Amino acid sequence: MQPSRSFASLFNSSFNSSSSPTLPRTPPTPWNPADESCCSEPDTYSTASHSLPGYKICRRELAKGAVWDSHCHLDFLARKLNRENIKGGESLRMSLQSDGQRLGEKFGGCIANFCDPRDWAQGPRSQEVSKILTSCKEQSGVFLTLGCHPHFADKMDGFCVQQLLRLAKKMKGRVVAIGECGLDKSGKNRVPMETQKKYFEAQIDIARELNLPLVLHIRGAEDEAKELLEKKKVPANFRIHYHCFTGTWKAAEAWLGAYPASKIGLTGLVTFDHARSVHEVARHIPLEKLLLETDAPYFLPSGVSKESYKHTFSQPGHVVHVAAQVGKTISE
């Protein structure tokens, strides 16, 4: 099966053909229909192999051997582009058409994460982002997650919770998870912990009601997150994407022991020499437990050619660099 040409042309490569990374070979993840009970058409869906184990993606969207970006932020990316004075409805498309070679069969698509309620609930920003959501809905090779990042938990209210549930139901089949959500005790987050917990719990409830995976953002609050998941009686076999993991392999192993259906997401951080704990995780984690992410527009991979890509932020196509570095780390 060939990847969507319309999507591949939207997200062009940012590297010259002479420096295209070599992608690791990963075995396919078997599809167990019993794990996909929330699919309305279980015979037409599969868990994606290669870089999206555990996510429900229509089989017709999957390309054999293609790498998918399991986590990016197209709304944040669009605003980055606008700050660079790239205007008009084609700004995203224009920006990602670099002078490098097209990704072709190496890049399958992405899961775009919308985690700021101001972007999907109500207000002027939601009107702007609704155009992106509509485009994603119509675009082959783009799937969505909806939720509230702990940094934005103070922007949530009862209306937002209901709107999140409504949108996830309305876009069933295109929305493949709830989140990113979770708890963050880092110095960058000033939202009170009680507020974070309140809306993390609300999103757990929605994920369980719709039988969708959770995409978790956890910083310095792993014990609290586990306690809350236990309080909500989230079963050990619930599907969880532990996004942007930066801890040690010991910590990852402990999490997988508690929630064995989880997947661990590694970002472009893995391409940097100083990220030793992330390298350790890449070296030891079973491939079927691994998800590849760009977290675009964050974590521009170190291997991106400055000659062919002029921006200072990442884009979904850069997941091929993440895949290449993981493959290199495994082989060392």
Regions found by a protein language model. Name each.
Residues Q2-E332:
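Mid-domain alpha/beta scaffold segments of enzyme catalytic cores
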